[in-house]
Amino acid sequence: MAAAVAAWPWALFCLAAVPPLLSPGAAGLSCCYHAKDNLMCRDVCEQILSSKSDSRLKHLLQRAPEYCPESMGEVWGCINSSLPGVLKKSDGWVGLGCCELAIAVECRQACKQASSKNDILKVCRKEYENALFSCINRNEMGSICCSYAGHHTNCREYCQAIFRTDSSPGPSQIKAVENYCASISPQLIHCVNNYTQSYPMRNPTDSLYCCDRAEDYACQTACKRILMSMKTELEIVDGLIEGCKTMPLPQDPLWQCFLESSRSVHPGVTVHPPPSTGLDGAKLHCCSKANSSTCRELCTKLYSTSWGSSQSWQEFDRFCEYNAVEVSMLTCLADVREPCQLGCRNLSYCTNFNNRPTELFRSCNSQSDQGAMNDMKLWEKGSIKMPFINIPVLDINKCQPEMWKAIACSLQIKPCHSKSRGSIICKSDCVEILKKCGDHNKFPEGHTAESICELLSPTDDLENCIPLDTYLSPSSLGNIVEDVTHPCNPNPCAANQLCEVNRKGCQSGELCLPYLCVPGCKLGEASDFIVRQGTLIQVPSSAGDVGCYKICTCGHTGLLENCVEMHCVDLQKSCIVGGQKKSHGTSFNIDCNVCSCFAGNLICSTRQCLTEHSSEDERQKFTGLPCNCVDQFVPVCGQNGRTYPSACIARCVGLQDNQFEFGSCISKDPCNPNPCSKNQRCIPKKQVCLTSFGKFECSQHECVPRQLNCDQTQDPVCDTDSVEYSNVCTLYQKGKNLAYRGPCQPFCKSVEPVCGHNGETYSSVCAAYSDRVAVDYYGHCQAVGVLSDYGFHTECAFVKCPQLSATGCKPVIAPGACCPLCAGMLRILYDKDKLDNFARVTNKKPITVLDILEKLRLHVSVPQCDVFGYLSIESEIVILIIPVDQKPKPLQIEACNKEAEKIESLINSDSPTLASHVPLSALIASQVQVSFSISSPSVKVGPVLHCLFISFSFTLLKLMDYI
């Protein structure tokens, strides 16, 4: 036991293979009696012996020496005998505590079985396992230094604290070592000083030797100039990207050298352990979309747990990167590397791409602009070099130079279609330019202009390719583009931050920027994909198994934490519909309903349909409402928090009679009778739940502690007297009633009820917006709105619709609404089982419509548009992306349309841009409808409407900002 105890300081015990559930029994717990005089040790002992989780047990064992000193041999001897096989001596291998930092699985296993660093050198490659070797070096140094402490416990503990973390030791830590160890061991002080003195910031010129690794002479020169003139890491990285005309790649010798020098030269430099998400969890998500097993395996190898060899990268480039049949995987990878963003401006070479605020581009920046000019210079030499073919061309300065410039700029700036997100030029343009300007005598044997273009641009479908004539002339908008702005494009934030549109406004006296830089996490050590801190993220299993995912939290350390494995989904399962096989992920229509096959399960909307085969009797009974319910508005409130127009419709969507009650949900008082305890206050919190309310209670209130003193949290709310408070606590402390969340608005002082698109009557426009519900018309809800393409509902004829917000707009009518509006509209199918699983493995709370809206809102990049939505009575989530100005310009309406089309495409393609986020990954199919501009100055609406719709208070940007 003495030998075992001596190993404690460096976490030299580890979990062996043991059954996951241990039952210590009374004999085991009696071990802790030996620690009766040390309550902290006794508590840890009891936690160890009662732990039912391997990971929890491992954590406790690593922390135990801090509470149970080595002198308590009886405790450790008893634990060893009570949990045989759990504690294993590691014979002095100080690197054991670092093994979890290994990226490659085989390296991690070798580390756990090793007895010295030499044992892992053949398996673990230093160039890839920087974090592991840095940790081992630190522990080796710590083992030597702290051994001088002998049996002096305090000195040893303060010494160990210096080496326990991979961050720089603070002055107080160093001072503590001096105080406790100076009189005990001068050698220890000298050893620690040698270690801590390596921490001052490195001089950038120390890395000048890396510049010689650059393959391009211009890059070598720029690198040396930058390292000798710039000081901060951010300046240096940005300068190198601009000077070398390349983005950082881990396989690039220059960047590889910088990584090695910054991480492993000093043993204490900060190196975060890689998360259990593979090297790039976002790109790993794309691998399952590969059409061929070869590309799927290569993709998985490159982005899972260890860097692929240079041969793997070359093979992926050769067989997959430009393969037209792999368009689904390649588009997905492009979404991760360079997501499509609205707007392009400030280019000096590709000037025809400027001033296009409502078009999508992947790479509108100065580097790509310069890259296009460089490409043109290379092509002037008479050859266009592609990875799989060289294309000989005539003098491009004389033969269609503007067309060639448009091609070079398109390849670099990468315009992308709002629906397909494709960035390739159209085949007809490719054939035309090669027929005119290709050097046919030098074409590769057997190739023609058509065959070459079949490899490069195999389609003329305008939803999947970019026509070049768009960029042969400047934008028709000129410089008048201020109607639509893009605060996050180009990205103003640091590399570890996420840029978000500032919709909250600013406190008085604050510098108010149109964007917010929020801390985030990367989805893997080699990932540039940033997610918001505090959010739940879905990532593929790090092994890359298709259909296997885990849910993680983006923690405050900037790393993904608390990962929980989900049940694997069989993506090979198909659905049989009408005798036809439908593959996973396929969306299609059955009559008027949109359906999707998800892992063998058929998920459809519940629209009532008329078909060409419908009988005369069916046509006469047809109402357009679910189950052909009668067009009567007698609202009932379901236990999911949704108001349904009638009991018939509630039953049709699956509610039992005991699962709804008459009256709208908003009219119910969830705090009467009071469901909270005496020391708590009941606060109404209306929500519409998407999860099964039988599994996760859809409560309409929250119980909060009664506080004498409220904190200073700024989360403005407005009471029923139009008085504003800093937060809900302050409002209730004053004995007031909540009217709506968000700052008080002058126009809401005179309370006038409005009907939301969800069929709920709100006390004011502000109250509706606080639920992120847009307004259909003024007054109490009185009708079931339009649902069917086959006709209209007579009750809407009695509704007075406001004036339309813009002329020249062909409006949309949201399902269940009466009045038209200028907006982009999405009707989305979701997987309820998946949402239930998310709720089960996370916080056991229901997932709501508001959860979806708040997440989608972050993906709308134009501040002139905002997101509203509701659950329709046809089992779809309806999303409305609406201009916020009272009289929106055509450009703003178009921007909202493009945002809607972009989100539809991301949902339908299962792009990691959305699918990485919980709960957005449960959105499986979407249909978009946009209110495009028409030439006529006025809009004629159907006879039932006779009226036009105003966007009510979409001028109220301040209100939008807080809601």
Swiss-Prot record:
Which residues does the record list as glycosylated? N80, N194, N291, N346
Signal peptide residue numbers = 1-28
Question: Which residue range or ranges hold the Kazal-like domain?
Answer: 621-667, 692-746, 749-783
The keyword Mitochondrion is assigned to this record: no
Q: Where is this site: Reactive bond?
A: D631, Q632, Q712, T713, K749, S750
Detail the disulphide connectivity of this chain as listed in its UniProt entry.
C627-C652, C629-C648, C637-C665, C710-C729, C718-C744, C755-C781
Q: Where is this region: 5 X Knot repeats?
A: 31-332
Q: Which SUPFAM superfamilies does the record associate with it?
A: Kazal-type serine protease inhibitors
Q: Where is the lipid attached (GPI-anchor amidated serine)?
A: S936
Alphabetized UniProt keyword annotations: Cell membrane, Disulfide bond, Glycoprotein, GPI-anchor, Lipoprotein, Membrane, Protease inhibitor, Repeat, Serine protease inhibitor, Signal, Wnt signaling pathway
| Topology in the lipid bilayer | Lipid-anchor; GPI-anchor
Broad class of the protein's primary localization? membrane
Name the domain of life this protein comes from: Eukaryota
Which ranges of residues are annotated as propeptide in this record?
937-963
Where does the protein end up?
Answer: Cell membrane
What does the UniProt record tell us about how this protein is modified after translation?
A: Localizes to the plasma membrane via its GPI-anchor. Released from the plasma membrane following cleavage of the GPI-anchor by GDPD5/GPE2.
Q: Which Pfam families match?
A: CC4_RECK (PF23332), EGF1_RECK (PF25027), EGF2_RECK (PF22955), FnI_RECK (PF25028), FZ_RECK (PF23298), Kazal_2 (PF07648), RECK-like_N (PF22961)
Q: What is this protein called?
A: Reversion-inducing cysteine-rich protein with Kazal motifs
Q: What is the lineage of its organism?
A: Eukaryota, Metazoa, Chordata, Craniata, Vertebrata
Q: Which gene encodes it?
A: RECK
